[in-house]
Curated annotation (Swiss-Prot):
Keywords: Cell membrane, Membrane, Transmembrane, Transmembrane helix. It is found in: Cell membrane. Its main location: membrane. This is UPF0754 membrane protein Exig_0680. GO terms for cellular component: plasma membrane. Pfam families: DUF445. Belongs to the UPF0754 family. Disulfide bonds: none annotated. The chain crosses the membrane at residues 5-25, 357-377.
Length: 378
């Protein structure tokens, strides 16, 4: 009886010892995946199996994980497929619409927004406007200077000038007639006649004789008749028309001195700049410009923009991924992870499985111990 009890105790002991050995061995094997974190030495000799498998092969793990992510998880095809889903388009549209609403209802002025990016926006904008206007006016001046005056005025302007010539001649002759009828005109005639007699006849007898005759009274009616004559009117009209025609055929550049041209440009620029209410525009709240356009921007432009953005992303997704180099990013991020933290991640995912492996080791060890005990008894 005592022998049987001893055999049972030995059998149980062998089973327990086998189970403990199996469980401890498996638990130790699992721990050796992560620990120790660094190589251990006895003197100058490294202890085998140190560091643990994962710390030892950390670089290979990071590289393989990076390749796996790029080749099998985050692929261009998968991302393109995801981008084509309506939820992505809707999310982008909604995000842009929210930004548009924020800007279209903003009470901030253009000046406040501009001052975030540039100092003294009004002065710099004024300078740029003046430079731009100056360039445009210079360009216009170059084009205009090579054109004939008749081309600049156009057919309508040229016709108006030519139509006005008869009236101008009429006014000119009328003013001339009135001038010679006036005391100043008579005095001028007397001076002219006196100078003529003095220069041509001198102080001789004939000159003294003419000096006593009122020649102006004789000339004035005749001069008036000539001025009022149709032939004079026609002659003056033809002469003016010829001069006007000659003038209209000249280029604008031939009529302007460089200094006069510069003065005209400066005056035009000054006039344009003073008419631009730049300060008032910069101090206007942003919503006053954009709020009337909010519905059109949000309902028409934003969906179109979102669609174009998604299509562009789909077209460029492979190039974007190549530029981002996701494999390198994953590898570098895994390399940066603390090994203890990496161990915690793996254990948090596989803790039950590792525990089951430990119990399985204990079970197998116990079975082996039982088989050994049976063989020992037999």
């Amino acid at each position: 009886m005592q022998v049987e009890v001893d055999l049972v105790i030995k059998m149980i002991g062998m089973i327990v010892i086998g189970a403990l050995i199996g469980a401890v061995t498996n638990h130790l094997a699992i721990r050796m995946l992560f620990r120790p974190l660094e190589a251990k030495y006895i003197g100058k000799y490294r202890i085998p199996f140190t560091p643990g498998l994962i710390p030892k092969r950390r670089d290979e793990l990071a590289a393989n994980l990076g390749r796996t992510v790029v080749k099998h998880l985050l692929t261009p095809e998968g991302i393109s497929k995801r981008l084509q889903q309506p939820i992505v388009y809707q999310a982008i549209t909604r995000m842009i619409q929210q930004e548009v609403q924020k800007w279209t209802r903003s009470t901030k002025t253009i000046r406040e927004i501009a001052e975030r990016f540039v100092a003294n926006p009004e002065g710099k904008l004024q300078q740029q406007i003046e430079q731009r206007i100056d360039q445009e006016l210079e360009s216009m001046a170059v084009a205009i200077k090579t054109a004939r005056l008749t081309e600049v005025l156009g057919e309508g302007g040229t016709t108006k000038i030519k139509t006005a010539i008869p009236g101008m001649v009429e006014v000119l002759l009328h003013q001339t007639e009135q001038y010679f009828d006036s005391p100043a005109g008579k005095m001028k005639l007397e001076e002219t006649v006196a100078q003529f007699i003095q220069s041509k006849l001198g102080g001789g007898m004939f000159g003294m004789l003419l000096a006593n005759v009122n020649i102006v009274e004789m000339i004035q009616p005749e001069l008036k008749r000539v001025i009022q004559g149709k032939s004079t009117h026609q002659f003056i009209s033809e002469m003016v028309e010829q001069e006007v025609h000659t003038l209209l055929e000249r280029t604008v550049g031939s009529l302007l001195e460089p200094e006069a041209e510069r003065q005209i440009i400066e005056r035009m620029k000054s006039e344009i700049v003073t008419r631009i209410p730049l300060a008032a525009l910069l101090d206007t709240p942003l919503h006053e410009f954009l709020e009337p356009l909010e519905v059109r921007i949000s309902q028409e432009m934003v969906p179109m923009l979102s669609k174009q953005m998604v299509n562009r992303l789909i077209e460029q997704v492979e190039q974007i991924m190549a530029t981002l180099d996701l494999e390198t990013i994953v590898r570098e991020e895994v390399d940066l992870l603390d090994t203890a933290y990496l161990e915690e991640i793996v254990l948090s995912i596989s803790r039950r499985e590792f525990r089951a492996i430990t119990w399985l080791g204990g079970l197998l060890g116990g079975l082996i111990g039982m088989i050994q005990a049976i063989l020992l008894i037999v």
